[in-house]
Amino acid sequence: MLMWICPNCGREFKRVNQSHYCGKAPASIDEYILKQEKNIQSTLFSLKNTIHDAIPEAEETIAWSMPTWKKKGNIIHFAVSKNHIGVYVGQEAVLFFNERLKGVETYNGVIRLKLNQEIPLSLISDIAKWNYTMDQMD
């Protein structure tokens, strides 16, 4: 199988131009956001603040090089890809919020928001709260 090698860090990937961090992962969510393109940083800070306000008791960390909120387990993550922001909420949340997610692309527990799309912050807040509640029940 052909592998792509990043010319900057020398890491090998299965896909050409695989999105990744050269070097070490960011130490904080703010650092993650500040490493992204300037034109989406304000959107990412709005997303971060929405999740923080929804579940202030959750720990904010970086896991798998993604902004992550967790308590007992992982609650919600997000990551920037080439063409979208992926909000990793889990398949159970996607199914539970199916009606409110109509018209929003989802795949395997991930909400995919196009970079030029308005972020449904109220919906993300509600999903974060629901996931937090489900996490505490486990």
Predicted features, each with a name:
Residues 1-138:
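Charge-dense, helix-prone N-terminal extensions
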